[in-house]
Amino acid sequence: MPILSTEIFNEADAGFVYQSNSNDYSDGFEGPEKKLDIRFGPISKGSVKSIAGSPSKVGLRTIDKEKWQTVLDSARCTIISQTSNDHMDSYVLSESSLFVYPRRAMIKTCGTTTLLHLIAKMVQVGKECGLEVEMVVFSRKNLNQPSKQVFPHCSFSDEVNFLNKIFDGQAYVMGDVNKDHWNLYIADFRKNPTLQRTEQTFEVMMHDLDETVMKQFFKREGVSAWDTTVNSGIADLLPGSMIDDFQFDPCGYSMNGLLNEFYWTIHITPESHCSYVSFDTNVALADYNQLLAKVLNVFKPGRFTAALYAEDGAPCGDPYTAFDVNVPSYAIQNKTVHGFDGGYDVVVSNYQQLDKKVNFSNDDLIQSIESTNIDLIQV
């Protein structure tokens, strides 16, 4: 398997040095998240760990909250709350979310967290469950203040170099590197990549939010997180969900939603000078036009990026047409499409509200991108 074992890989030996996480948010909180999606397969026949008498507690779901916290310590975030259903375990974190399936873990962290530093522990946890890594997907939108991040998250090229010391993957930049864009790294070790797979994920990353809307996400006496979830319209986005929500003090909001085997999550940074909202789900829809319209109606962003990952056989069909290019009240800035040999496609589109002029903040330096393998189709 093309991955360094946890016995020989550690950050110090590889020349990686932890820096102090000062949480310097004087110029605004860094809302855009780093996202790590790791899928596992059995090391051998019958190797996957299970808990007797608990049919749903298989593989990664046999790991308890305390053990997950030791993994998350490497990313410098903590578990706030936990919910579960028959399909997965959900954790709201101090900086975003963790979702755990029997053979998959999806972690999102914002701020100055060090998400990639937890990979070695994730690999070890998988081994303890009789699992090995089959696929790794790391992604993030461009950051507002990359210079305040902790290595390797100051630039995408540093992140790619870090990942390539562990995996043999490929890196892509989707969108205009001078404006809003999406960074993507994929390492695919699946033994049967041509088999039909049906996973799809949809993300909406929003900036320049309506200030009246954002006022709801400042903590107020006598107003609970659930009150905010209902009053804002979040509860109506995917009805029938189990929702775990949290209101931060003095401001900020996170929620995880479970809808049968699907997750969805929202994270909100409401301050006007750095406002940001993310919506992320793997709910299986034939198209995302209605859901996208509902999300935009709730938050009213000045600009947003929509990203769709879809495998062959996914309900959305051709991801290129899964959400409408012509979004009412918004002008599309660019659309980037990439098809992968493993049988999946990614579409990323950037939109700007028609009556708003956008001033972009400092982005990852272009020269830090040029050292990566950029492979895209601009349409």
UniProtKB/Swiss-Prot annotation:
Task: Tell me which UniProt keywords the record has, alphabetically.
Answer: Autocatalytic cleavage, Decarboxylase, Lyase, Polyamine biosynthesis, Pyruvate, S-adenosyl-L-methionine, Schiff base, Spermidine biosynthesis, Zymogen
Keyword hit for S-adenosyl-L-methionine: yes
Q: Specify one Pfam family.
A: SAM_decarbox
Kindly list the residues the record flags as site (Cleavage (non-hydrolytic)).
E95, S96
Its catalytic activity? S-adenosyl-L-methionine + H(+) = S-adenosyl 3-(methylsulfanyl)propylamine + CO2
The record's account of how the chain is modified after translation: Is synthesized initially as an inactive proenzyme. Formation of the active enzyme involves a self-maturation process in which the active site pyruvoyl group is generated from an internal serine residue via an autocatalytic post-translational modification. Two non-identical subunits are generated from the proenzyme in this reaction, and the pyruvate is formed at the N-terminus of the alpha chain, which is derived from the carboxyl end of the proenzyme.
What InterPro entries does the record tag this protein with? AdoMetDC-like, S-AdoMet_decarboxylase_euk, S-AdoMet_deCO2ase_core, S-AdoMet_deCO2ase_CS
Taken from the UniProt entry, a GO cellular component term is: cytosol
Xref: PROSITE patterns: ADOMETDC
Q: What is its EC number?
A: 4.1.1.50
The family note in this entry says:
Belongs to the eukaryotic AdoMetDC family.
Q: Which NCBIfam families match?
A: SAM_DCase
Record note on quaternary structure: Heterotetramer of two alpha and two beta chains.
Its protein name is S-adenosylmethionine decarboxylase proenzyme
Q: Which organism is it from?
A: Dictyostelium discoideum
Q: What is the lineage of its organism?
A: Eukaryota, Amoebozoa, Evosea, Eumycetozoa, Dictyostelia
Tell me the name of the encoding gene: amd1
